[in-house]
Amino acid sequence: MTKEQTWSQRFESALHPAIARFNASIGFDIELIEYDLTGSQAHAKMLAHTGIISSEEGEQLVAGLEQIRQEHRQGKFHPGVDAEDVHFAVEKRLTEIVGDVGKKLHTARSRNDQVGTDTRLYLRDQIQQIKSELREFQGVLLDIAEKHVETLIPGYTHLQRAQPVSLAHHLLAYFQMAQRDWERLGDVSRRVNISPLGCGALAGTTFPIDRHYTAKLLDFDNIYANSLDGVSDRDFAIEFLCAASLIMVHLSRLAEEVILWSSEEFRFVILKDSCATGSSIMPQKKNPDVPELVRGKTGRVFGHLQAMLVIMKGLPLAYNKDLQEDKEGLFDSVNTVKASLEAMTILLREGLEFRTQRLAQAVTEDFSNATDVADYLAARGVPFREAYNLVGKVVKTSIAAGKLLKDLELEEWQQLHPAFAADIYEAISPRQVVAARNSHGGTGFVQVSKALIAARAQIDQ
């Protein structure tokens, strides 16, 4: 890299080629080019609007920037190896197109407020895309749940069977997680959508700019009130990475369950060929690569969040070159979340089939109805703790005898406590166990049906 940089006039010697490569960000911040062009067009219009440059010059700049946009979209814009970053690459090409007037674009602007603007425009756009993908993911969850209101599945605590639940209820738990993710991104958007443009390098500018004018052109809700804060703030990126990490947590939890459910030990779901792979040595294998990759990629997003926190923790005001390191992790996190949402949505919609007969069997082969025996006694006046202790002994005795609760004779029940009657068998049937939990937010069929209606209304708004 031997050509002069825009800032090189103060220096007596050229930048060492290895240092130039180390310093350059064009290899990754080219991702921001569309946003850099949009922000620069708004800046050019503002310069003309305030009389800092002429209207004709403003029009030339806007047109030249639009030409670069078209060149980029057509694959014809190729920044040279001497381009330090996307900002210099655009300015260099603009000057080639419109001549010396292109050198006026950077009036009253620093790369510090410029890159902050670009990054916010990029992230604002990506957040909307992720929110749309979340809605699609939620929609698929509801499509499946609506078919399985009365399909029962074992519910677990400590990965031990606890109580049976409606499969729809189980899926709605993930819907609610995704809803919080969707809302959280909306919260982040409000702090992303603040304009730093016009903050300059750190202290503002001597030119009579109109920051509100550019903010309006770029659809920002407000402007930074402090120029030092405006150029050095990356809270918005950290907040996004926190939200992205939580999205991946939720996807990873679902992925883990799909992996378990598809195993021979569970056999709750069948993975279809379109969303599974095989083994290079074991011909019988069908591997759950999609959920495994989602589970694995979660660590990438966590890592980018941690990296950003470490970058920011010791930075004095205002801009520091460390902030160049905010982008690759941010870009990768955005791409990882979008790809993971898409993959899990496809897996649910096209690659997964619940084995309803196996699920029906699974909810009858354990003691997950034991709580309902205690509830049965409590409803008949027996103190719950006394009933709880009694049922614990019954379970212990039944296990020793190789029986389930449903296998006990009525005489055996009544020997345990006279409150037991013939209706105990209905009370502890899996279907009744689920139906009886009719409290708001519970797994009872009536409540689940109401929850599905409410959830559908949420995403249809």
Swiss-Prot record:
Pathway field: Amino-acid biosynthesis; L-arginine biosynthesis; L-arginine from L-ornithine and carbamoyl phosphate: step 3/3
Predominant localisation class: cytoplasm
MF-aspect GO terms: argininosuccinate lyase activity
Gene3D superfamilies linked: Fumarase/aspartase (C-terminal domain), Fumarase/aspartase (Central domain), Fumarase/aspartase (N-terminal domain)
Catalytic activity: 2-(N(omega)-L-arginino)succinate = fumarate + L-arginine
Keywords attached to this entry: Amino-acid biosynthesis, Arginine biosynthesis, Cytoplasm, Lyase
Biological process annotations from GO: arginine biosynthetic process via ornithine; L-arginine biosynthetic process
Enzyme class: lyase
SUPFAM superfamilies per the UniProt record, alphabetical: L-aspartase-like (SSF48557)
UniProt KW Cytoplasm keyword: yes
EC number: 4.3.2.1
One Gene Ontology cellular component annotation held by this UniProt entry: cytosol
Keyword Cytoplasm assigned: yes
One Pfam family hit: Lyase_1
Location of the protein in the cell: Cytoplasm
Cross-referenced CDD domains: Argininosuccinate_lyase
Family: Belongs to the lyase 1 family. Argininosuccinate lyase subfamily.
Subunit structure: Homotetramer.
Protein name (Swiss-Prot/TrEMBL): Argininosuccinate lyase
Originating organism: Nostoc punctiforme (strain ATCC 29133 / PCC 73102)
Encoding gene per record: argH
